[in-house]
Amino acid sequence: MRFSFDRDAMIKEISIAQEIITNKSPVSILSNILLIAENNSLVIKATDSTVKFTTTVPVEIQEEGRTTIYCDKFMQILSQSPSGEIEFIQEDIKVTIKPAAKKVKFELKSQTSDKFPEIGTSENLPFFEIASKDFKEMIQHTIFAVSDDKNRYFMTGAYFLKKDEKLTMVATDGRRLSCVNKPAYEAGDFTPAIIPVKILSCILKNAPEEGNIQIAVVDKSIFVKFANHEFSSVLIDGQFPNYQKVIPEGLTQSIMVNKADLDAALKRTTIVVDKKVSRIIFKISSGVLKLISPESDSGAADEEIPCRYDGQDISMALNYTYVTDPLKVIESENVVFDFNVNEETGGEASITKAVIMRSEPAGDYIHVIMPMNY
């Protein structure tokens, strides 16, 4: 096998392959990428056995063939090579890589392609299209709420379904929940799916901002295509919780605060917060939100910022990361917390049941947060 390629075009694709590959052992075939040179293009395949990736790069082929090489070393060679043409030559198990712009050559050992796991074709699958921007926004607003508790494996991915002509993505770790709805476009019916975080992260990082992407959910797998890229993943097997029961209804009160003010105040007051607890107290009164970091081994802090609220004095304790994570992706100037007030013993008003955090005006996503005890 012998071909030449453009270094910059190749490095973009190999960097994506590296995201897929988790086994870094040079003796494991899963540490390799499969290269297939034919029809003046190079097909590149990578997998960790669960997530699979296929892409195509234009190359000039002198001799067709296929092989596998250690992805990590190939990426290091590309990273240290100058832009321009690079020659790739395979003879038996030896691969020679020669950048045209430098008097240097590298030699790698290859493994035969018949040892590489089969990555099947997605032809004839029932793909539907969705705006890439919409799907990426669905991921952005849910991925941080996915649980990392392996004992509750059915919550270690984002739930994706079609209902009432809408596409919905939901994630929860049991203490917070994020939900996004988008138009279903021309999507056909499919079985609701729990999508692993890894493929969602790859799509979020690599899908374009403009145009559409194609999605198919079939046979306990999801397939995603855009540009010259195709990703697929085995879905998480399990029963996702009934998320609709978690979303509170009939909330009668709200506080609105400037997003930038809240973000900056949280960054300051959480400097001394106990990171094992991550608790911040919100004390809300007419026109004023006071953020309090309770006294810890590091110290204490509080800060007042203006807000729009004209009800009784109330308070609630929240895990501050459950607030800062949505703040990173909410784009509106102001954010709103919707809630109901509970009267506790002693007459002090507090919020102890689920709170909805959202944009203002309301968008197609919500973030549900359970208050903490304090």
Residue ranges and their predicted role:
Residues M1-Y374:
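Structural preference for solvent-exposed beta-strand-turn elements
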